[in-house]
Every structure is written in C-alpha cells, then in structure tokens.
Design a protein with these regions (language model features):
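Terminal-proximal segments
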Residues: 1-72, 82
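Active-site helix-to-loop segments that bind/position phosphate- or nucleotide-bearing substrates
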Residues: 1-19, 29, 35, 87-229, ...
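A surface-exposed, charged beta-strand/loop segment in the N-terminal or early-internal portion
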Residues: 40, 48-121
C-alpha cells in the first residue's frame, strides 16, 4: 500500500519556493522561513503568484512530487509534472472508453450512485446523531427521494439522464444542507450553492474544500498512470481535470462536505476568517485557509476501513485507492468500478 506522505500548502502570496540540495525552501524577501526534505513530500500546492524556482520544478518533476499552482482564491491555475511512467496502453484504453458512450455510461453511473448514496448517508447520520437539532421529517423526505434517484440510476443507460438525475439529487441534498449547520447560524448559513463567486461563508468553505479534493484526485490519477484531463462523466474542456472531477463525485459528501460541517460545528472556523469583496464575493482570508488546511491534513491521517478492500487505511489514501481501482477496471481486471460507499 502506498505510504501517505505530506503535502506542503503555501497560502501566503508573498512566499517564494526554491531548492537547496534535497530540501525545499519557503522564503519571503530572501529570508528562509521553512526548510523541508523533499523525500517527506508527495505534493506542493501554492496559493499565490510570487513563484517557484526552475530548479525546484525540475526536482519535483524528477521525484514525482506534484506541484500545483492556485490563485489566492483557490482557483486552479497550472501544475508541473514529470514523465508519466504509467503504461501507455492503459491511457490509450482510457481514451477509447472516454470516446465510447456505451463504455463510459456504466462507470459514470456507478460514480453518481456512489455520490447519491454517500450524500444520503451524511443526511441519515445527522438525523441519528442530532435528532433534537434538525428537522428529521424534512431530511427523511429527502433521503427517500435520494433512494428513488438511486433506483432510477440502476436502470439508466443515457449519459444525459445520468447527469439529470445527479443534478436533481444534488438539489435535493442541498435543500436541507442548512439543517446540518448546528453552530453560529447567524454567520454560517446555507441557502443554495453558489460558487463563481461564493456569496457566503459556507459556500466559500465548500469551494476551498472541493479545490483541495480535486487536486488530490488529479494527483492520484496521474500517479497510477491515468490522464486526469480525460473523463467519462465530465466532458473534455481545455484545462479541466475532467477525470479528477469524475472521481471526486463519490467523495464530495463524505470527504469534503462533512469536513466543512465539522469545522463549522466545532467552531474551528470563525467569522473573522472571511473577507467580503465589493462585488459580494466572500473569500477565505490567509488565516482561514491556513486553519482549514491544517485541519484537512489532520483529517487525512484518520483511519477508516475501506468498504471494498476491507483494509484499514488513512482517509488521505482514499483518492489513490479509488484511482487504482479505476485503473484496474480500465485494464480489464475488474468487471465494474467499485465505487466508494461509506458505511
């Protein structure tokens, strides 16, 4: 099993990254703030424009360390990767499946079944753990509808229909999402999904969590030899990591949404961690991003039992395991994609 290493997140735009021997340096105005051995890292994510030295880019590419660039708001800009050592036959088969609706539909269908199942689990967990604080009847009505969406998917053989069911299910799920926010509801409330830009604190947190998750899915797919830009459910678009977006669908609710809710309900994230722009956009400030990233790294260390493998592994390895299982399906070693179903 792959070892879970650390990811270095650089959230302050003024920081510059450089190489010193076998170490990465984080500098500000030529002053060394952090020195970390490269062999302890599996990825570097930087939120800013100051830059990274060509020497460090080359060292990361050579060692297979992912290097991703985001703008200060968390929007993906670019990534640096080295030689793809995956089997070219695997990627050619991935492209064939992507071009074939008949072959893509079963994979996309399983991924969306997983997304809806896990969304339902998050809601059911809330009614079990917080029955006196949530509207149990309203949530149960939604979970019954989600069950019906899963039944519809089991018989669905149209990609457009799969996308339509997914959209309806997401709308149902988010219609009661505000029920799951139990603390500081004056500042943390949810009315609807808005993302470009986020217009409230909760949507700002969801956007940031989804950005982190999408990046980790892209890194995992690349590591197993797949092309993160060629998906089955999400169509090809220049610059879009379509397969990473496919893979993260089943993980959104249990990996990202629950994480955001935990930070709010435990009061880890506070109202002062956000800034509101003149255009109404609400963004996390530097302190908020650092707090969220620190908690994200801790969450990745938690152990769970993988529902398909039966092994206890760290949460942070789930994207990698699912990428491996997807690669096995594409190679023909599995009959269907074993979507992650949290129990």
């Amino acid at each position: 099993m792959r070892k879970l290493l650390n990811t270095l997140y650089v959230t302050t735009p003024e920081r510059y990254l450089a190489l010193d021997g076998e170490n990465v340096l984080v500098l500000e105005e030529k002053k060394i703030l952090i020195r970390l051995p490269l062999h302890n890292l599996e990825g570097i994510v930087t939120f800013g424009y100051t830059g990274v030295s060509p020497a460090l880019m080359g060292a990361c590419a050579k060692r297979g360390i992912s290097l991703s660039f985001m703008n200060p708001n968390g929007q993906f800009l670019a990534s640096v990767s080295g030689e793809n050592k995956g089997n070219v036959i695997l990627r050619k088969q991935q492209y064939r499946i992507s071009d074939s609706l008949e072959d893509s539909i079963p994979i996309a269908r399983n991924m969306i079944i997983g997304k809806i199942y896990n969304s339902k689990w998050v809601l059911e967990r809330a009614t079990r753990d917080h029955a006196l604080q949530v509207d149990v009847d309203a949530i149960k009505k939604v979970t019954a509808n989600l069950d019906e969406h899963i039944r519809q998917l089991l018989e669905c053989d149209s990609m457009d229909r799969i996308r339509g069911i997914e959209g309806n299910a997401a709308s149902q799920y988010f219609s009661v999402f505000d029920q799951l926010i139990l603390q500081n509801k004056e500042e943390f409330f949810f009315e609807n999904r808005n993302r470009r830009p986020p217009l409230d604190n909760v949507n700002a947190m969801l956007l940031f969590a989804y950005t982190l998750l999408a990046n980790e899915c892209a890194v995992a797919l690349t590591a197993v030899g797949l092309d993160a830009y060629v998906g089955f459910l999400h169509t090809d678009r220049p610059g879009r990591i379509s397969l990473a977006l496919d893979l993260m669908e089943e993980l959104r609710a249990v990996y990202a949404d629950r994480f955001v809710l935990t930070l709010i309900n435990k009061k880890t994230i506070k109202p002062e961690h956000f800034v509101k722009k003149e255009n109404g956009a609400v963004l996390m400030n530097d302190t908020g991003r650092k707090t969220m990233i620190s908690a994200w790294q801790g969450r990745k260390r938690d152990k769970i039992k993988h529902p398909f493998l039966g092994d206890k592994i760290e949460w942070g390895l789930i994207p990698h395991v699912q990428a491996l299982l997807l690669a096995r399906l594409i190679r023909g070693d599995l009959d269907e994609y074993p979507v992650f179903l949290w129990k």
